[in-house]
């Protein structure tokens, strides 16, 4: 085994019928970690059900079905390898909670792969005013996914087959709306593919010999290496807190920024509880330090389980410790809200691992969501498609940060009526100083 490949996360976006599952399934099938025996079993079942047409999509269908039945699937199934990278596919959209997952998601995507159905009629629907494609692209950009690869899929089904003029038409149209969203289309490779037949997915296709650019695999290899935020101060949102016999209290979560190591003194926001980290574990192995992206459990001394909750944030007590937000200002984009949102609206915010009702205290401005220019000061309300700056006040103690400083703690989904009705990016936070916070003996000793 050579040196471990760099890990990157990819989010696959596009209209429901664009062939996302087939394309993703194809990559995982050809380059992934799915056991041959599992594939044979799937193939046999697919054949029995006459599902041959879904040549690769069933790979994903099976994975999704198993996940929905609560069978935790080995995450390796959602991985595939390029020459340079080990790629993880983030929850393929189309899923009802996709938007929420993309925001609070356990991972920030390094690159978005936009799949477009090149056949006539369908392409127009996917990109029309209310098209999902546009919404997904806007969402990806707003949430800081700065790199994009665009696949013109189903080239085997254009009229005539593998039509260059069709491809050119799509490149022109998609470029213009990617530009409106905020991407630079000159930096976006447009790869003509067939996820079904396999053209230009991994090997070059003679059917598309008019195309001289990279295959999908090559385009993935050309993604810029992401910078990981290990040099920022520690911020680790808690997912759970366990009491483990013989060890004690073990909070669990994903390191978003910075590093955590044994011997460190940590402060938990929003309460300000401060204690020493005794040990750090990843997959039951003790580590000397854990880095951004690692899911860790860490043992803390003299702390009761009831003193910590999901949504609290562990931080370095000597370096920008996490504090309660008194209020914060965010740029909010309204997505699927049926009515009008005005001052006093109090939906639930999902931000990192916290899930707390927050009041829209003051809608300060309405802005053009593409240029950021102010359209109206102190508007009476915001409705679907609008964007604006809003001052928000949490109804319970919560930790948030600015998107610029700590991206995973600075983006949120607004949930109401069992769906995501808006997304936001935090621009500024006013913090409260903790009062009467408990500092354990272990922490005092370390001071």
Curated annotation (Swiss-Prot):
Report the family membership. Answer: Belongs to the TRAFAC class translation factor GTPase superfamily. Classic translation factor GTPase family. EF-Tu/EF-1A subfamily.
- Principal location: cytoplasm
Q: InterPro entries of this UniProt entry?
A: EFTu-like_2, G_TR_CS, GTP-eEF1A_C, P-loop_NTPase, T_Tr_GTP-bd_dom, TRAFAC_GTPase_members, Transl_B-barrel_sf, Transl_elong_EF1A/Init_IF2_C
The tr-type G domain covers: 5-230
Q: Does the keyword Protein biosynthesis apply?
A: yes
Instruction: Give the source lineage, highest ranks first.
Output: Eukaryota, Viridiplantae, Streptophyta, Embryophyta, Tracheophyta
Top-rank taxon of the source lineage equals Eukaryota
Q: Identify residues that carry N6-methyllysine.
A: 261
What task does this protein carry out? This protein promotes the GTP-dependent binding of aminoacyl-tRNA to the A-site of ribosomes during protein biosynthesis.
Residues with N6,N6,N6-trimethyllysine modification: 79, 187, 306, 396
Identify this protein by name.
Answer: Elongation factor 1-alpha
Residue ranges for the region (G3) are 91-94
GO molecular function, a single term: GTPase activity
What are the 5-glutamyl glycerylphosphorylethanolamine sites (modified residues) in this protein? 289, 362
Q: Name one GO cellular component term.
A: cytoplasm
Q: Region labeled G1 — which residues?
A: 14-21
Region (G5), start-end ranges:
194-196
């Amino acid at each position: 085994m050579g040196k471990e490949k760099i890990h990157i996360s990819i989010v696959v976006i596009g209209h429901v019928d664009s062939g996302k599952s087939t394309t993703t399934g194809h990559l995982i099938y050809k380059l992934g970690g799915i056991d041959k025996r599992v594939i044979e079993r799937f193939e046999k079942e697919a054949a029995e059900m006459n599902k041959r047409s879904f040549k690769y999509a069933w790979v994903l269908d099976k994975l999704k079905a198993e996940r929905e039945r609560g069978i935790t699937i080995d995450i390796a199934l959602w991985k595939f390898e390029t020459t340079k990278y080990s790629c993880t596919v983030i929850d393929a959209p189309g899923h009802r909670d996709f938007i929420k997952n993309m925001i609070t998601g356990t991972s920030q995507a390094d690159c978005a792969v936009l799949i477009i159905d090149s056949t006539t009629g369908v392409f127009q629907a996917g990109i029309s005013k209310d098209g999902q494609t546009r919404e997904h692209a806007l969402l990806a950009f707003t949430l800081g996914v700065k790199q994009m690869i665009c696949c013109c899929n189903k080239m085997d089904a254009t009229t005539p087959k593998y039509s260059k003029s069709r491809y050119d038409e799509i490149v022109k149209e998609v470029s213009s709306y990617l530009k409106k969203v905020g991407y630079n289309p000159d930096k976006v490779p447009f790869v003509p593919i067939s996820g079904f037949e396999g053209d230009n997915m991994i090997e070059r296709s003679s059917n598309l010999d008019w195309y001289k650019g990279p295959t999908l695999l090559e385009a993935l290899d050309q993604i810029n290496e992401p910078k990981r935020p290990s040099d920022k101060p520690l911020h680790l949102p808690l997912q759970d807190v366990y009491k483990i016999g013989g060890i004690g209290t073990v909070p669990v979560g994903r390191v978003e920024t910075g590093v955590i190591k044994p011997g460190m003194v940590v402060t938990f926001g929003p309460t300000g509880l401060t204690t020493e980290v005794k040990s750090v574990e990843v997959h039951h192995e003790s580590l000397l330090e854990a880095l951004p992206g690692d899911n860790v459990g860490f043992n803390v001394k003299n702390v009761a389980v009831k003193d910590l909750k999901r949504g609290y944030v562990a931080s370095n007590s000597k370096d920008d410790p996490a504090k309660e937000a008194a209020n914060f200002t965010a740029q909010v984009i309204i997505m699927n809200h049926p009515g009008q949102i005005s001052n006093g609206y109090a939906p639930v915010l999902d931000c990192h691992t916290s899930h707390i009702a927050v009041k829209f205290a003051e809608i300060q401005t309405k802005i053009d969501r593409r240029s950021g220019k102010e359209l109206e000061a102190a508007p009476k309300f915001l409705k679907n498609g609008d964007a604006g700056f809003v001052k928000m006040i949490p109804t319970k103690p919560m930790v948030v940060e600015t998107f610029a400083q700590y991206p995973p703690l600075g983006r949120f989904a607004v949930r109401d009526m069992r769906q995501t009705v808006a997304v936001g990016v935090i621009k500024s936070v006013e913090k409260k100083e903790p009062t009467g916070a408990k500092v354990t003996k272990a922490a005092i000793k370390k001071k």
